Amino acid sequence: MTMAGGRRGLVAPQNTFLENIVRRSNDTNFVLGNAQIVDWPIVYSNDGFCKLSGYHRAEVMQKSSACSFMYGELTDKDTVEKVRQTFENYEMNSFEILMYKKNRTPVWFFVKIAPIRNEQDKVVLFLCTFSDITAFKQPIEDDSCKGWGKFARLTRALTSSRGVLQQLAPSVQKGENVHKHSRLAEVLQLGSDILPQYKQEAPKTPPHIILHYCVFKTTWDWIILILTFYTAILVPYNVSFKTRQNNVAWLVVDSIVDVIFLVDIVLNFHTTFVGPAGEVISDPKLIRMNYLKTWFVIDLLSCLPYDVINAFENVDEVSAFMGDPGKIGFADQIPPPLEGRESQGISSLFSSLKVVRLLRLGRVARKLDHYIEYGAAVLVLLVCVFGLAAHWMACIWYSIGDYEIFDEDTKTIRNNSWLYQLALDIGTPYQFNGSGSGKWEGGPSKNSVYISSLYFTMTSLTSVGFGNIAPSTDIEKIFAVAIMMIGSLLYATIFGNVTTIFQQMYANTNRYHEMLNSVRDFLKLYQVPKGLSERVMDYIVSTWSMSRGIDTEKVLQICPKDMRADICVHLNRKVFKEHPAFRLASDGCLRALAMEFQTVHCAPGDLIYHAGESVDSLCFVVSGSLEVIQDDEVVAILGKGDVFGDVFWKEATLAQSCANVRALTYCDLHVIKRDALQKVLEFYTAFSHSFSRNLILTYNLRKRIVFRKISDVKREEEERMKRKNEAPLILPPDHPVRRLFQRFRQQKEARLAAERGGRDLDDLDVEKGNALTDHTSANHSLVKASVVTVRESPATPVSFQAATTSTVSDHAKLHAPGSECLGPKAVSCDPAKRKGWARFKDACGKGEDWNKVSKAESMETLPERTKAPGEATLKKTDSCDSGITKSDLRLDNVGETRSPQDRSPILAEVKHSFYPIPEQTLQATVLEVKYELKEDIKALNAKMTSIEKQLSEILRILMSRGSAQSPQETGEISRPQSPESDRDIFGAS
């Protein structure tokens, strides 16, 4: 039984590009390439190309659409360049090129390249067709081939190129010398009609084709339904009561009805219908063939204009022997002439042929499934059928009475007829007019007779039978028996078992509508977007039309295990027959695999795999087409016979999908889970080897394709050219950026000058520098350790000036190996040259400046120290920063052997070689560093406490002296003119 969705068909938008190409290119070998990825990789190849080239589909996937993998030493380089230019310029072109098959056999191909556009008029694919023209390129006449060898070669060439010759034959005229190159290119030229767009679109109907579910056709069907009931009621009435023989008005009405039914026949030749798989058939040829095989003959017989044919007959003589048109008339006792009897017989024949119009009820039968899914409509139709049967039997009951009331032998009225008894009961008896017309007159009227007939048939069909109208003659009794038999059957079937009929006939319909209502309520409750809602509804309708509401799992559970396995093998027979991986499987192995397979139906737009999702299934495409999308680009198009997923039998881990797999059309997939497949392969070891060797995935979702988009390459090229053509940036001399760089350059030059001065001072201070030079040079190829030394004088109590001078000269005089005295914006290392505010600032800021020294600055002069190790030696003394420097040294040199020189400050400037040491020695070294670090931290805390006391003493002296001075002097002390002021504040005081 067809559901509402099945009656309408599957009308969701779908991408039928691949199906259109395959259907229109039955004898063409072609590949499809992505036009938006570098090298235009192949995303689909048909079976013809695989047979022609010798490659498997999985082997050519992701290779260049230019088929560079088929080039060889004899391939023309100029033609290859032209092919590349055609791809780059998105042009349509054709070439003749020599390529090589997989077995390296050279073959001449005629290649046609055509761009495919999407709904945005953007080229997204390339269609490349290949035709073997080797027979036309190789000369038949060859000196090496003579006699039968030449004939065999000619026969082989003609046989291999029979399809091309059949195309060329109609266009070749006798006596013409046709150029093979141009003629072949012209014949194999693809027109624009064979290049559909790559986009999703609703099913299109050709011109002059009407959709069977459109508003116009629905309205027309209702009109036909009403006229069909009109015909079913009036045709039996007119035939039985012999009315409208000469009534022109009714003749015109019946003729109009006949014309409408003839128009309906014409429309049926141009109306779509739903195919067995739920698809909408819009091909005009298929529509016509389907209608001619089904309802055409019946519709044609029911539409013949019998009234018009009967009107052209000579019925004037017949009317002279008929009674009053308003009453029931009978023939005169005088027999009519022979011509009148012949005319009356012909007229009665055509009047009886009107009954053929009842075949129009077939139109109701074919559309009955449109309405019987609703309970109220079914009840109304059943009541109408019962009433229509009573109407037909009433007409037959009157015809029997009209035939029985007149005795042909005695030319008298039979008083045992039910019409005679009815005439007596209602007071209108029959009378013979002997003086006038000489006919029988009187009797009941037409309306009274019809109502009485309908009353009798109704009481008989319902088995009531009041008995006021009863059969008297033998024919009437036989018909009464037939009425009672038919009535009992109709009554018991229609009225006695209505509930049972509904439960048995419409159980699936009720479940279907219950499911639809539940889905609609769910979508409405959670406010699912309209687009997604339509996809859900379309999927449910399409799935129901495919399964007809049958629960496959429930049916299989009823069957025993052996029978269930046989059914599963039958359901998956397409997968087992089409793929060579299952050819060596035993019956037991196939049955085990079939039990694990699942059939999945996908609607257009459904995502089978999302990027990043676990690939836990192996999918076989049985029907439909899908696309594989990676980074918003189509990298493969999968069709019937393709396999995608992951090679579970070779990988130990569960893979993540690197792309999205989306259905383009309605698809049927046969899916087997990873665990189930591995379980079967582990049990059937022999089959597992054959399976892993012969099963080739069309697309492996585990592997990610690395590609570059042409748009990205072009954008990078444009940016590079733009930077190349840009004018250089010219800054004026007084620009802030230029001034900033000049300042950095000056500071760097000053720092380098200070380094050179510091090295000269260090050479004078080091006592054993020259003695150690030779020892250091001897070991310069090994690992070196440099130690940062700091000078510091013993801490002694001094006065304010002495403390200040000592702090500037000793505490803040920190040296890095081979570097200058560190300080903010230091130009000279001699603190005696600074005055006033600058001297006080240096005294307070030296500790912070040492922490700001970066490791990169300390390592800048490392190559120079390596070349002249004796120039950068410094003395190691105790200071507040020595602990930190010492700890850094130890941590940097963890794992190296410590020598006595490392522990002695005197030999710190000597560079030593270090070698790997055992783990225990390393642990001892780390512990020693830890203890030394603790001691250094304690010394640092003591020194910080001493510094705080000195600072508090300085603040106390400043406050005491500030209170004795005037406000003008106080302001001068608190706000000096500049850091480099020559005025010595402390000296002035």
From Swiss-Prot:
Any one GO cellular component localisation term in the record: axon
Activity modulation notes: Channel activity is inhibited by interaction with Ca(2+)-bound calmodulin. Interaction of a single pore-forming alpha subunit with a calmodulin chain is sufficient to promote channel closure. Channel activity is not regulated by cyclic nucleotides. Channel activity is inhibited by binding intracellular phosphatidylinositol-3,5-bisphosphate and phosphatidylinositol-4,5-bisphosphate (PIP2), but is not inhibited by phosphatidylinositol 4-phosphate.
Interaction with cyclic nucleotide-binding pocket, as annotated region: 699-701
Entry keyword annotation includes Phosphoprotein: yes
Main subcellular localisation: membrane
Keywords tagged on the record: Calmodulin-binding, Cell membrane, Cell projection, Endosome, Glycoprotein, Ion channel, Ion transport, Lipid-binding, Membrane, Nucleus, Phosphoprotein, Postsynaptic cell membrane, Potassium, Potassium channel, Potassium transport, Synapse, Transmembrane, Transmembrane helix, Transport, Voltage-gated channel
Record bears the keyword Nucleotide-binding: no
Sequence ranges of Polar residues compositional bias: 962-979
Location of the motif Selectivity filter: 463-468
Modified residues (Phosphoserine): S974, S978, S981
Transmembrane segments: 221-241, 249-269, 291-309, 346-368, 378-399, 478-498
GO terms, molecular function: calmodulin binding; delayed rectifier potassium channel activity; phosphatidylinositol bisphosphate binding; voltage-gated monoatomic ion channel activity involved in regulation of presynaptic membrane potential
Domain PAS: start-end pairs: 14-94
Membrane topology recorded in Swiss-Prot or TrEMBL: Multi-pass membrane protein
PTM comment: Channel activity is regulated via tyrosine phosphorylation/dephosphorylation by SRC and PTPN6.
UniProt subcellular location: Cell membrane; Nucleus inner membrane; Cell projection, Dendrite; Cell projection, Axon
Tissue: Detected in brain (at protein level). Highly expressed in olfactory bulb. Detected in brain cortex, hippocampus, brain stem, striatum, thalamus, hypothalamus and spinal cord.
Null mutant phenotype: No visible phenotype. Mice are viable and fertile, and have normal brain morphology. Likewise, there is no change in the electrophysiological properties of cerebellar Purkinje cells and in the shape and frequency of action potentials.
Record family assignment: Belongs to the potassium channel family. H (Eag) (TC 1.A.1.20) subfamily. Kv10.1/KCNH1 sub-subfamily.
Free-text function comment from the UniProt entry: Pore-forming (alpha) subunit of a voltage-gated delayed rectifier potassium channel that mediates outward-rectifying potassium currents which, on depolarization, reaches a steady-state level and do not inactivate. The activation kinetics depend on the prepulse potential and external divalent cation concentration. With negative prepulses, the current activation is delayed and slowed down several fold, whereas more positive prepulses speed up activation. The time course of activation is biphasic with a fast and a slowly activating current component.
Quaternary state and interactors: Homomultimer. The potassium channel is composed of a homo- or heterotetrameric complex of pore-forming alpha subunits that can associate with modulating beta subunits. Heteromultimer with KCNH5/EAG2. Interacts with ALG10B. Interacts with RABEP1. Interacts (via C-terminus) with CTTN. Interacts (via C-terminal cytoplasmic region) with Ca(2+)-bound calmodulin.
Protein name, UniProt field: Voltage-gated delayed rectifier potassium channel KCNH1
Species name: Mus musculus (Mouse)
Gene (name only): Kcnh1
